[in-house]
Amino acid sequence: MVILSHFKRPILNIKYFISLRSLLLFNRMKKILTIIFAVLFFGSLSAKANEELTIEKQLVGIVGAISGTVKTETRELKTGDKIYLNETILAGAGSGTQILLLDQSTFTIGEDSEVVMDTFIYDPATNDGKIVASVKQGSLKVISGLISKKNPDSLTVEVPEGTLGSRGTEFQTIVSRGKTDTLLIGPGKNNTLGMRPGAVLVGNNFGSTLLDNPYSITSIDQRQSSWSGKKDY
């Protein structure tokens, strides 16, 4: 089955729904991301002692990697830039970015995408919080972090056709031409690594389906208000 990848489409089969280019880039950036994250995180705590940040300037994460041209409404992004609440992230053709959130969640945004961080509440002392993002179009891959580890139901992604409720997992969604495809990557309920199983609840006013097996996928068609049903691979 040929489907869309993060950066180029269509080129990959179901088990390579995640862009290999994206994964390799993330591995190379992992150590750098950790250093940047620590500097910005503790720097932001210090800044709070000296100034009051408005909601519009609330820090939610940093840019870990960039491919091509990625912008917000007011600036072109580069590696290491801060990302704030309510900013719209726009990735152009052949472009993409990885965002590392303060709770260590990772958002990978693919080409021709528009993603907004609508809600980000995080207490680093307890790892309590809530994350809500919306995908207007394009691709978003989510690896959940400390907030979801504490409370698996605390991360939601809104799409034009419905809502994706992450339950402490890794998944990808693609919004294109009135349809949303959502893939659960894992870990599944029968994983051999001793990891807590993850799942994604995909739903709207017409119904819902639970993805709880790795590489299970479902589609919502906005024009027909219909579901493709869950498929496992």
Model-derived features: where do they sit?
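Bacterial N-terminal signal peptides
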Residues: I35-G43
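Flexible, surface-exposed loop/linker segments and immediately adjacent secondary-structure boundaries
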Residues: K48-T88, G92, G96, D103-Y233
